[in-house]
Regions:
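Alpha-helical membrane insertion/targeting regions
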Residues: 1-211
Length: 211
């Protein structure tokens, strides 16, 4: 009786992962268009921020590149097919991901230095580095299941760089970016992302009664 149950569970898990990655991809595309494309096009509401971006470009360029590397390496390394068939590539990309996290974290803190958003950015960067470090350590210790869990947490923090920009076109939201409300928002997005991952990692235990 167990075999049919397991066979039924696998397609469900596969479909869920596919839907999840599609949603993540569509959200990323939406944010790219409504934030980055409009920023380059000098959208009126973004004009003051555009000037700030130009002024901060020396730190912002490595920060952005690091974030992009982490954002796109994550889904590749979560692929069990790539991990099994191209393990060397998986390890190389994992190292690039880890370096990107630390570069993104420190440049993010440097960009926020002396500004109201520093507490939120520092907390986000700390969570990002801690989760990624735990993922690296558990991988080196060959605790693969635990490694995957920490990578899920790390990528949840990575994705806050996208999720926190979904509402950018809403004036009431955009007008508070850069002030104390922004710092609270970054912390809230980070904690919410980690909470969602924890619920996902423990969903079976939360929904199944042990006999």
């Amino acid at each position: 009786m167990l075999a049919p149950t397991l066979r039924a569970a696998r397609p469900f898990g596969f479909r869920f992962k596919r839907i999840l990655w599609v949603c993540i991809g569509l959200t990323t595309l939406f944010v790219f268009i409504t934030s980055e494309v409009l920023l380059v096009a000098d959208y009126p509401m973004y004009h003051a921020y555009r000037l700030q971006v130009i002024a901060d470009r020396q730190l912002l360029i490595p920060h952005t590149l690091a974030g992009i590397f982490a954002l796109f390496i994550g889904p590749i390394n979560f692929s069990s097919r790539i991990r099994q068939r191209h393990f060397t590539l998986h390890r190389v990309l994992g190292r690039i991901y880890a370096v990107s996290v630390f570069v993104g974290s420190f440049t993010g803190i440097a960009l926020a230095w002396g500004r109201p958003g520093l507490p939120g950015t520092s907390m986000q960067a700390a969570a990002w580095m801690v989760c990624t470090t735990a993922a690296v350590v558990t991988a080196r210790n060959r605790q693969i299941d635990v490694h995957r869990q920490w990578m899920a947490r790390s990528y949840a923090v990575t994705f806050t760089f996208v999720s926190s920009r979904v509402l950018n076109l809403v004036p009431a939201y955009w007008n508070h970016l850069g002030d104390v409300f922004s710092a609270v928002g970054v912390i809230a997005f980070t904690l919410a992302s980690l909470l969602i991952v924890e619920l996902g990692l423990n969903w079976h235990e939360l929904t199944t009664h042990r006999r």
